[in-house]
């Protein structure tokens, strides 16, 4: 896989596919980025290219605008933050239309000098970006490719998507992987190939079905698999426990029984949970044993004893991978489990990886220092699919 060091970019236009898909607070007059982690992660690649005299054209998606312009998903607010982090102006090439690489964008890009940068409008304003029709996708890839002479893939969070800007454009231009993609791959290889032991994995989130592939891939490799979040209730049901009104995938119970039989004592489930009479921050709550959830009550977090149990299992780990919150951390009464696990991972002396998505958001929301972890991934789904051993379209396109 080529790197940006292999490209002679001085004086040339370089299309960089970054991942600037950040959350925006739109409650005020001006949209405000609430978590700029992905913007910051994109800077090393862009800065390196600019320092070498490239004329950089940054592209990204934001949210799911359904293939047509939607002002609330505009990347314009991100251009300002990117300029602050780069320490130089960023020309925004959007004009409010879905013509992402049209006349206005071409004019902005043509006006770039060496060491200057522009940001295209949200790629997903164009139906061709995510189209299942290869011809439609190819036509949009042709438009994007016409803007540049080189392509750099640096959107690790999107490499599992067969989208035009991720998988089709690199077939049309000399290409390389960006700094972020290379860093993410190095980290994931450490997790999947001969990790230092003991190796503990913490999985949370809502559904077993969403994590089944990674569970099956990692279970033979780990010393402990700690299961929290909504998915733990299907495992508890597989043990014969009632789970009240908690999230339950009945179709996955038999699968969980098989996993429990395979994993034995290496699969660690909560011993207590925080339950509520309804899904609300002001609900009545209680801490109950994991096998004594009252009928109609919802399990919304792991309990304090479970948090201590998980922390103890993490304390001596040489390698830790954490993906998925332990509860509904966005609501204060159900955040303690996620905070406790995050703090335990952060306090460990081994190699610790936070697996993107909601886990990364939880770290920042709860105010835990990011530098306490060895790595916070920008790719939730991409990280999991890599660990499952799947072929990721965006990586396959760069590796030729």
Curated annotation (Swiss-Prot):
PROSITE patterns: PGLYCERATE_KINASE. Its main location: cytoplasm. SUPFAM superfamilies: Phosphoglycerate kinase. It holds the Pfam family PGK. Keywords: ATP-binding, Cytoplasm, Glycolysis, Kinase, Nucleotide-binding, Transferase. It catalyses: (2R)-3-phosphoglycerate + ATP = (2R)-3-phospho-glyceroyl phosphate + ADP. It is an enzyme of class 2 (transferase). GO terms for molecular function: ADP binding; ATP binding; phosphoglycerate kinase activity. ATP binds at residues 211, 299, 330, 356-359. GO terms for cellular component: cytosol. Substrate binds at residues 19-21, 38, 61-64, 124, 161. One of its GO terms (biological process) is glycolytic process. Its EC number is 2.7.2.3. Pathway: Carbohydrate degradation; glycolysis; pyruvate from D-glyceraldehyde 3-phosphate: step 2/5. It is found in: Cytoplasm. HAMAP family: Phosphoglyc_kinase. PANTHER family: PHOSPHOGLYCERATE KINASE, PHOSPHOGLYCERATE KINASE 1, CHLOROPLASTIC-RELATED. Belongs to the phosphoglycerate kinase family. Monomer. This is Phosphoglycerate kinase. The gene is pgk.
